[in-house]
Amino acid sequence: MFIILKFLISFFLICNFFNYNDHFASGQTLPPGFCPSPLIYRNSTNRQNDIENGYLFIGQTNCTSPCPSLIFSENEWHRVYNMSLIAGTISMFALIFLIITYSPLVNKYNGYTRHTVGILFLFCGIFLTVTTDGRQLWDIDLGFEKYCPEPGRFARQSDTKCLVTAIFFQYGCVTSILWWAAISVDLWMTIRKVKISKLQFITYAVILNIITLILTFAPIASKQYGYGEAAIGCWLMDLKYQVGYFWAPVGFCLCVGCVSIVLIIREIYKVSDAIKKKLLAKHLKPLMLIILMLSEFIYMFIFYSYTTSRRGHYHDVVEKYIRCLFINASNPSICEVDVSISSPAHFFFHFCMRLMGIEGLIFFGFTRQTKRIWLRSFWLNNSFIKKLIPSLSSISSDEKTSNSSHRTTRGCRETEFGESIEQSNDPEHFIELSGVDSKN
């Protein structure tokens, strides 16, 4: 009797086969409360409202997709979330150090130029990105509940935590890419010895931040922030909004960055060997960071473009998996999701974001300029610290004496990184890092 009943149920399900996300036929019915694992049954009284709240229904049934989605196995999801926790935490502390170093808390106002301000904005943007995406120290115990507040429900902007983290994540991403492009242009202007006034500097800084605010807050009106099927945090959901409010600006910034790098290399190549060595000595670290970040942005851009082009394939894979679930309703464990998106490639995509903070520490944290900023700061240059650590006082005094000697006896000029470069009577031999002219 049990075998006959099992056969009838399987026959009924096959005959009433449905499509996934509009790929299945509409108007199907299933036994009340029945959904093969890992699909989740949702007793919906207001289907449209449930969809807006983040439930992904399978065709016209009351079965919903699990959260996180079926695109990866649970182990693969845990792997990428654990990476976001470990790499993100390291990156977060590295960025905190860099932000404090270049902020008014430590760096004196007269040490600010368009380049140092650009670096500060860049690091702040990356910091917002790594602390609002994936898993962090302060929400380890939440597990998937942070982005899956209820079984089978993906978080939406109606969920306060999702909206707040999505806003900060989008703002951080846009800030990072815009100021990365600005820094790459600034490095070229530095080598070309181009100076701008304070008014011009403030103007383009304000414009960049206005663009960032528009690209961040405009999608809220269309309720576009939420947790997606391949994401590890809340962000823009619809493809057209992702392209219009992020990837199109990213593409433009990548073009600007590529052109700037080519022009920088061209300028370095044109000068004599002696000047070339000085240029490389002064600009090698910023240039390497710009090139590394360019390669990471390009990888993320290519990965996103590739996965977007295969959205149809992803739905076909999930459709095949769900067919298997309903055909083998009594033994769903034999069904497996075929690989639609490479798990290692997806892992590296999210790792790239966290790698930027670590790279920032390597190229801007362990430098003479960082040491000089801290030694000049109030925190290490006060009577209490000098009494507590006498050796630090002598080092600070040596720094001041050295700087004074450079300015008076060698006709040196300080750069925005607090490093001196000898002047020459030949204007072609004078290297000036980016500065802001005090004249308006």
Curated annotation (Swiss-Prot):
Cytoplasmic side, ranges: 107-110, 184-200, 266-285, 368-440
Signal peptide residue numbers: 1-27
InterPro entries assigned: GPCR_2-like_7TM, GPCR_Fz/Smo-like
Membrane topology: Multi-pass membrane protein
Glycan attachment positions: 43, 62, 82, 328
Region described as Disordered: 395-428
Gene3D superfamilies with a match to the protein in the record: Rhodopsin 7-helix transmembrane proteins (1.20.1070.10)
Annotated compartments: Membrane
Chief location: membrane
Record-linked PANTHER family: FRIZZLED_SMOOTHENED-LIKE SANS CRD PROTEIN B-RELATED, G-PROTEIN-COUPLED RECEPTOR GPCR FAMILY PROTEIN
Protein name per UniProt: Frizzled/smoothened-like sans CRD protein D
Lineage, opening ranks: Eukaryota, Amoebozoa, Evosea, Eumycetozoa, Dictyostelia
